[in-house]
Curated annotation (Swiss-Prot):
PANTHER family: PHOSPHOLIPASE A2 FAMILY MEMBER, PHOSPHOLIPASE A2, MEMBRANE ASSOCIATED. This is Basic phospholipase A2 F16. It is found in: Secreted. One of its GO terms (cellular component) is extracellular region. Disulfide bonds join 26-115, 28-44, 43-95, 49-122, 50-88, 57-81, 75-86. It comes from Crotalus durissus terrificus. Its cofactor is Ca(2+). Pre-incubation with heparin markedly reduces the neurotoxicity of this toxin. The lineage of its organism: Eukaryota, Metazoa, Chordata, Craniata, Vertebrata. Belongs to the phospholipase A2 family. Group II subfamily. D49 sub-subfamily. Gene3D superfamilies: Phospholipase A2 domain. Snake venom phospholipase A2 (PLA2) that produces neuromuscular blockade in chick biventer cervicis preparations in the absence and presence of crotapotin. In contrast, in mouse phrenic nerve-diaphragm preparations, the neuromuscular blockade is dependent on crotapotin. PLA2 catalyzes the calcium-dependent hydrolysis of the 2-acyl groups in 3-sn-phosphoglycerides.
Length: 122
């Protein structure tokens, strides 16, 4: 669920999804288009692609099992959908942590109209 994804992001980056990631670049937040702006935005692009593989699942609201221990996120057992959504969220949160050194405040609340270039495909 979105709330669980927010907790994973906070665990990995020490930043809240809102405001730091909800409207970042061209892909973080709802939807996405054109070319990712940087490594952080690319994490969101890959997360969107991961969700596209599970379109029959309720990616925004399905509650899944996971734990945050010893610096790691571990997804638990559940339905196929819940396990896949958890993995998408876990991988994205870890990606955002790895991208912290290149995070740019200037890409927060980035207007869609400034997203340029051809859209990438998953």
């Amino acid at each position: 669920s979105l709330l669980q994804f927010n907790k994973m992001i906070k665990f990995e980056t020490r930043k809240n999804a809102v405001p730091f990631y909800a409207f970042y670049g061209c892909y973080c937040g709802w939807g996405g288009r054109r070319r990712p702006k940087d490594a952080t935005d690319r994490c969101c692009f890959v997360h969107d692609c991961c969700y596209e593989k599970v379109t029959k699942c309720n990616t925004k609201w399905d509650i899944y099992r996971y734990s945050l221990k010893s610096g790691y996120i571990t997804c638990g057992k559940g339905t196929w959908c819940k396990e896949q959504i958890c993995e998408c969220d876990r991988v994205a949160a870890e990606c955002l942590r790895r991208s912290l050194s290149t995070y740019k405040n200037g890409y927060m609340f980035y207007p869609d109209s400034r997203c340029r270039g051809p859209s990438e495909t998953c």
